[in-house]
Curated annotation (Swiss-Prot):
Belongs to the class-I aminoacyl-tRNA synthetase family. It comes from Geobacillus kaustophilus (strain HTA426). Its main location: cytoplasm. A motif ('KMSKS' region) lies at residues 576-580. This is Leucine--tRNA ligase. Pfam families: Anticodon_1, tRNA-synt_1, tRNA-synt_1_2, tRNA-synt_1g.
Amino acid sequence: MSFNHREIEQKWQDYWEKNKTFRTPDDDDKPKFYVLDMFPYPSGAGLHVGHPEGYTATDILARMKRMQGYNVLHPMGWDAFGLPAEQYALDTGNDPAEFTQKNIDNFRRQIKSLGFSYDWDREINTTDPNYYKWTQWIFLKLYEKGLAYMDEVPVNWCPALGTVLANEEVINGRSERGGHPVIRKPMRQWMLKITAYADRLLEDLEELDWPESIKEMQRNWIGRSEGAEIEFAVHGHDETFTVFTTRPDTLFGATYTVLAPEHPLVEKITTPEQKPAVDAYLKEIQSKSDLERTDLAKEKTGVFTGAYAIHPVTGDRLPIWIADYVLMSYGTGAIMAVPAHDERDYEFAKKFHLPMKEVVAGGDIEKEPYTGDGEHINSEFLNGLNKQEAIDKMIAWLEEHGKGRKKVSYRLRDWLFSRQRYWGEPIPIIHWEDGTMTPVPEEELPLVLPKTDEIRPSGTGESPLANIEEWVNVVDPKTGKKGRRETNTMPQWAGSCWYYLRYIDPHNDKQLADPEKLKKWLPVDVYIGGAEHAVLHLLYARFWHKFLYDLGIVPTKEPFQKLFNQGMILGENNEKMSKSKGNVVNPDDIIESHGADTLRLYEMFMGPLEASIAWSTKGLDGARRFLDRVWRLFVTENGELNPNIVDEPANDTLERIYHQTVKKVTEDYESLRFNTAISQLMVFINEAYKAEQMKKEYMEGFVKLLSPVCPHIGEELWQKLGHTDTIAYEPWPTYDETKLVEDVVEIVVQINGKVRSRLHVPVDLPKEALEERALADEKIKEQLEGKTVRKVIAVPGKLVNIVAN
C-alpha cells in the first residue's frame, strides 16, 4: 500500500500556515542559527527543479537546528527588479510591476507546495518601495562619504535600440536581442568606489569558511599587484603620462610606449601626418568589448601617433603608439613596452618591426620573450642585480628623482552603478540648472518609481524615465531654481546587496533594521546558492556590508560566515536544462505525480550537493519506492500503526544500527552530505524489516531523522505514532557511544590463505582462545585431516590463518 501524497502534503501545508509553525521570534534566548538561500529572480517561467536543490538543503539544516534547540531564521523573498521584466514590458506594452507580481505569486505558490519551513511573515521584495527606500538610503550614505560619484565611462551603446546595454547583453559586438550593431560611447555614469575597500575585501577572505575556489575567484577579480608608477614626458609638448608596471626593473628595456585608444592625450599629441590613420583606427575598434580587446590569442593591432615619449632615465625618445590591448579602465591606460620581456609587447613589436633590448639575461629573445628572473644587463646602475634587488633600486631612484613612486594596483575597477533602464530603483539625486547636484532629502525617501504605460527607450541614452516630464522636472521651493531628477536607475545587484539584513527586521519603517536584532542574528551562519554568483553578487554584498560596518550599522565585518554552492541539475541527456532544448522538468508535475517529499528526497540523494548531475526519472521512481517502503513499515493496510512497533521488544535487534544511524545522519546533515545520510536511513529501514518487533523509541527517532528531508510524511507518521503536536520542535535524537560497537564479530578462518570457515565470536576474545575456537571448528577439523599444522596466526577481531601440509 502506498500513501496518498496529495492529501498528506496539502493537510500539513495548511496546518503549518494556519499555526504559523515556522514563525521566528526575536525575543528568544535560544542560540541563533541564520540559514539563507540566494533569493530567486521571479521569472515568467516559474520555478524549475534546480531551485529546490539548494532550498531543500537549507531547509534540512533549518529543520534539524530547530529540533536541536536553536532559534532559526530561515527566510525567503524576491530579487524582482531586472531586465527580463522590462524587456517583457517593451515587447507587450504591459506594466512590469504587474508582470512581476504575477510571477512572484506563482513562485510563492510553487515554493509553498514543496513544504519549505520559511517564515513567510518576513517575505521581502526588492521592488517594494518600503524595501527600496533603504536601498536608496544606503546610496545616499555612499554619496555622503564620497563613495558614489559621476564619471565619464565608455558604455555599450546600441543606436538601433536607443539604449545602453550591459556587457552580458552584447555578443560579438552586436545586441543579444535583434543582433543590432553596438558601439562604445562615453557617457556620464554613477560609479561606486569599491576600490576603496579592495585590501579589506582581499584580507578578510581568510576568515571565511568558503570554498577555496570561490575565494580564489574573488582574489583574482580584485587582482592586487605591487609595482611602480613611472612618469613619461612627451617630447615637444608640455604633457606627461603615467604608466603602472609590476616590473620597474626592466625600464632600461623600454623601446616604445602604448596608450589606450580612449586616453585623453591621444587627441593632443597625434601629429597631422598620423591623424587620418589614428582616426580610422579609433573608428575600427569602437565596437570591441574589453574582453575581445584583451584576448591573448587575437592578433595585435595598433597605430603610431607620430609623437615620442622621453625615457625618464636615459632621455632617449620612445615612439608613442595606440593599441586596443591597453585598456583605459586598467592601471593608468598607458604602458611602457618592454618587448624582450613581455609576451604582448613582444608580439606587437614583431608585428610592427619595433626594436627590442634585452635587459635580463637568461633567455633567447630571438625566439621568445624572457619573463623569468636573472641578472640585469644593459641597465646602467642595475647591472648584475637580480629581479627583486633591481625593482627596489629602480623604485628608490625614481622616487629620489621625482620620476615615479612605489604603487599597488588592482584589477578591480570601481562599480558602474547606473543603468539606462526604467525597471530599477530610482537614484535619489537632483541635477540643477546651475550644474550642481543635491541628494533627495532622507525624509522624502522612498523616491518612488513612477507608474507609466509607456516604457520605451528615450533614444538619447537616458532611461525611459527621461520621458516622464512631470516626474523628472522639479523646482526648488526655496529658490525657484529648476532641476531634473536623475533618470538612471540602480542595477539589479543593488537590492540583493543587503537583503539578508532586511529579513532580520523586515517591517521597520524607522531604520534599515534594529541594531539589537542585527547584533543577535549576524553573521549569516550558512548561505547556499549557485556558483554563478561567485564573484559579483558576493563581492558587492561584502562591499556594502563593510561600508555599513564602518557606519556602525552592522556589528560584523563580513555578512556570510559559511558559503556553499550547490551543483546544477542537468537534463536527462546531461545537457543544461533550457526551454529551447525541451528538457526542462517542472516541479509542479513531479509534485502532482510523485509528491514534494519524493522530489526533495530524490534531489538530496542524487549525489553530492556540490556536483552537477543529470536528472533521472528512474532515480525519482526509486525515491518514491523508498518512501512507500517506509510507510508500509509503519502503517497497516487499514491505516493503523503497525502492531510490531512496541515499547519493549522481546528481542532488541535494532539497538546498534539505530545508534549508528543517529550518529551518521546527524554528522552528515551538519556537513551537507545529504546523499550519504539518506543511504544510512535506507540501511536502517532494511534492518527494521528483518526485525520481528521494533522498539517505538527507535522508530520515533527514525521519523525525526527523516522529517527534515521529507517533512510531510514525517509529520503524518509522527501523528500515527500517537502524537498530536507538530514534529518541528521535538528534540533531535541522540546516540550512545557505547551502543555503537558490535559485541559479536565475524572472524574468517583460512587454511594456507584460503577461506574455509567463518566464526561469530565475542569482540574481545583474546588470541589464544581465538586459535582454540578455530581449531575446534567442525569444518576446519575436516579440512585438516591427515595434515600437520605448522603454524597458527590469529588476528583478534579479524582472522585466523592456519599453515598446514
